[in-house]
Amino acid sequence: MSKNSNLLDVKLFKRLMGYVLIYKFTFIFVAISAILISIFSTLTPYLIKIAVDDYLSLGRYDDFIFVICFMLLNLVLTVIFMFLFSYYANLLGQNVVYDIRIKLFKHILDFKMGYFDKSSVGRLVTRAVNDMETIASIFSQGLFMIVADLLQMLLVIFVMLFLSWKLSLTIFIVLPFILFATRQFQKSMKVAFNEVRSEVANLNSFVQERLTGMKIVQLFNREKIEYENFEKINEKHKKAWLKTVWYNSIFFPIAELSTSITVGLIVWYGGLSVVLKDTEITLGIIFLFIQLSQMLFRPLRQIADKF
C-alpha cells in the first residue's frame, strides 16, 4: 500500500470485499449481529423512558417488575450478540489477512533478484507484517463496528424525531460543530498515521540492513556514525507518533465538551418544557434524549479514531 493510500478508497474496498465474500456466511452473520446490537442498544434507553413515564411517575410500582425483567432480557441479548459479533468479526478479519498474506508472500517469491537489490527488505517486512495487521484491524475492529455505529446513529435520529422534534433540534444545533471537528481530526490523523507508517518502515529497514551488514559496519569502524543515524531516524519516528498524541489530546476534549453542552441544552429546554406543562416532553423523554445524544456522538468519535 502506498504512502498516500486511503483505507476507505472505493477500489481498495472492492478488492478487500473480494476476500471477505469467500467467507460470506460469516460475513452475513456478522452483519446481522451488528443490526441486532444497534436495535438492542437503542431499546435500552427507550425502556428507561417507559419506566419513568408509565410506571414511576404514575406510582405503578407493582407492575414495574415487568419492565425490569424486559430490561434484563434486553441486556442479556445485547451482551450475547456483542460477544458473537466481536468473535466472528475478528475471525473473519484474521481469515482475510491469512489469505492476503499467503498471496503476498507467494507474490514476493516470484520477484526477480533485481527487485531485492533496489527495494529495502525492511519496507517489505513492514508491508507483509504491519500493513497486514492494519487490514486485520479494519475488519475486526473498524469496518463492521463502523457499520454497526452508523446503523445505531440512524436509528437514534429516527427515534429522536419521532418522539420530539423540538428536543431533537437542541441536539442538531451542536451536531454540525462535532461533525466539523471530527472531519478535521480525521484528515489530520490520516496524514499523521501515514507519516508514522513511513517512519516505521524506515526504522525497520535501517535496523535490518545494519544487523545484516554488522561485519561491514564494524570493519569500517562506523559504529558511532550508524548510532547517530539511528538516533535521527528514531527521533523522526517519535515525533511522528507525538503528532497523533497531540491530535487526540485536542479532539477528544472538544468532543466531550460538545456532548456536555448538548446534555445541558436538553436539560434546560426539556426542564423548561416540563415546568410549562408541554405535553410532548416528559421526564422520561428528557432521560431518553440524554442517553440518545451520547449514543449519537460516541460513534462519531470512534469513527474518527479508527479512520
Predicted regions and their residues:
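Membrane-embedded alpha-helices of multi-pass transport/permease systems
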Residues: F81-Y88, L92, A136, L143, ...
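Membrane-integrated ABC transporters
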Residues: M1-S41, L56-F70, F85-A89, G93, ...
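Short alpha-helical transmembrane interface motifs in multi-pass membrane proteins
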Residues: S33, F66, F70, N74, ...
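Helix-loop-helix
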Residues: R60-D62, V159-I173, K243, Y247-F307
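Alpha-helical transmembrane segments
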Residues: I37, S41-P45, L73-N74, T78-G93, ...
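Transmembrane helices of ABC transporter permease
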Residues: I22, T26-I39, F70, N74, ...
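An intracellular "coupling" helix at the cytosolic face of ABC transporter transmembrane type-1 domains
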Residues: M17, I22-F25, M113-G114, N130-F139, ...
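Transmembrane alpha-helix boundary and packing residues in multipass membrane permease domains
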Residues: Y46, I50, D54, Y87, ...
